[in-house]
Amino acid sequence: THKKARNGRLRQGLIDKKSATNHFLVVMSDVVVSPPSKDQTADLVARLHAVGLRSTRQRLALAALLLDGRHRHVSADSLTREIQDSGTQMALGTVYNTLNQFTDAGLLRRVTVHNEHSVFDTNTDHHHHFYDIEQDRLYDIPAEQVQLAAIPDVPDGHNIEAVNVLIHISSQRD
């Protein structure tokens, strides 16, 4: 188990006791990923708690990658590869669950690009997207650059919650 592995590393002197008590420390298999600074960890813990999420190791590891202020678009698969490339093991299901929890909490925005393929956007401000179908890549479009000429009447008993524009693009061919 993780506790036994951590305690074994403590005895072997591979990690110091102070960092072992930091609950952000990600210990998966035999790999130890260094945590962010105490201030960064405290900020991530506060952000998660502010939206009603507990600060588990997995959530903190993903929050450190996603909530660092950079605007990015990630899929569960690409994020899992990024985590594994850093030497940390995390199940794809855990990544999916955490992305969905972050989305439900308003920390991320889901963009469904086609039937069963969603991309998660760290920019939660209102904006739209170009989707490059050849590169499987999203590009942000500022909301003010999209003008809607007319919106049909909403069925009785309903309100418009949001309008999200996704424009599919491909490379120009001569």
Predicted regions and their residues:
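C-terminal regulatory/oligomerization modules of transcriptional regulators
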Residues: 2-6, 14-40, 144-174
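Short amphipathic alpha-helical elements of helix-turn-helix/winged-helix folds
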Residues: 47, 64-69, 82
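Basic amphipathic alpha-helical segments that dock to polyanions
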Residues: 95-102
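Non-DNA-binding regulatory cores of transcription-related proteins
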Residues: 105-174
